Amino acid sequence: MSEAFNAALSALRALSRKMDVTANNIANSQTNNFKKSRVEMEDVYPAGVKVSISQVNTPGDMLPPDEALPPEERTQNLETSNVNIAEDLVNLIVTEHDFSANIKTIQTKNEMEKQLIDIKV
């Protein structure tokens, strides 16, 4: 297999992981005290793409104690998640375009190989 194919395949795996992490962030955006995760990708020649996932510890907004609860059940202020849904939706769109570009690389490689086989036949 060619280096371009391996690189594109590695990128697809990394982008899939990035989509998983972003989807998890969005799914937990309304969970108090949830800390979002961030995916960082690094080129690693010749293996392809290395994925690192880290937690983002910036604080979320603070909510006052729930006044609807009885006084004995009220706690201190609650912290909301630190997820910015708009930012994560933009990340999903960018990831989708990256995914498409890498799929196109694989398709182009396959078409070139097919043409070479047709020439030899």
Give the role of each language-model region.
Residues M1-V121:
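Amphipathic alpha-helical polymerization modules
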